[in-house]
Amino acid sequence: MSYLDGLQQCVDSLQISIGTLSSSIDTLESGIHDFPRIKHILKVQRHFNLISEDELSARQAKFEEIVKPILSKAFQRLEDSISSLQRQEDSLKTKYELQEARLDMLKNRPATSAFSVTTESSEQLKAIIAKRQKLVYTLERYTLQLQQKRGH
């Protein structure tokens, strides 16, 4: 009976191995049931090309060669525009002060018999006042534009 006992032990061992394999298959199956999705996720797709550091440095240098002159020209034009507006502002301030001085001089001039206010001189005075107001408005507008450009 020892022969049958040996066979029985082999059968028992085989059944234990089958049980272990079945549980291993169940464990693996639960682990790979999502395998198609994982396969799709792990699929190699290049969203970004990998380049060497030397190539990156070369491309950055080339980019700088292209962009720096453009930016320099733009900044120069901006500085020229600002200086032009500054000159216009200074010119308008000077013109305003001159007109204001002339107007004050006309207002402060004593009324004499030699200087009689005629309709022509009153019209000139009105024209000067209107021109002065226009210059004040223009000066304020240029000042605001200059402040906006400096602010940005």
Curated annotation (Swiss-Prot):
InterPro entries from the UniProt entry:
DASH_Spc19
| Keywords on record | Cell cycle, Cell division, Centromere, Chromosome, Chromosome partition, Cytoplasm, Cytoskeleton, Kinetochore, Microtubule, Mitosis, Nucleus
Per the record, the major location class is nucleus
- What are the subcellular locations of this protein? Nucleus; Cytoplasm, Cytoskeleton, Spindle; Chromosome, Centromere, Kinetochore; Cytoplasm, Cytoskeleton
Any Pfam family matching the protein = DASH_Spc19
Query: What's the domain of life for this entry?
Result: Eukaryota
Q: Which GO terms describe its biological process?
A: attachment of spindle microtubules to kinetochore; cell division; mitotic sister chromatid biorientation; protein transport along microtubule to mitotic spindle pole body; spindle attachment to meiosis I kinetochore
GO terms for CC? Answer: cytoplasm; DASH complex; spindle microtubule
How the protein assembles, per its UniProt entry? Component of the DASH complex consisting of ask1, dad1, dad2, dad3, dad4, dam1, duo1, dad5, spc19 and spc34, with a stoichiometry of one copy of each subunit per complex. Multiple DASH complexes oligomerize to form a ring that encircles spindle microtubules and organizes the rod-like NDC80 complexes of the outer kinetochore. DASH complex oligomerization strengthens microtubule attachments. On cytoplasmic microtubules, DASH complexes appear to form patches instead of rings.
The family this protein is said to belong to: Belongs to the DASH complex SPC19 family.
Its annotated function is as follows: Component of the DASH complex that connects microtubules with kinetochores and couples microtubule depolymerisation to chromosome movement; it is involved in retrieving kinetochores to the spindle poles before their re-orientation on the spindle in early mitosis and allows microtubule depolymerization to pull chromosomes apart and resist detachment during anaphase.
The identity of this protein, by name, is: DASH complex subunit spc19
Q: Which species does this protein come from? A: Schizosaccharomyces pombe (strain 972 / ATCC 24843) (Fission yeast)
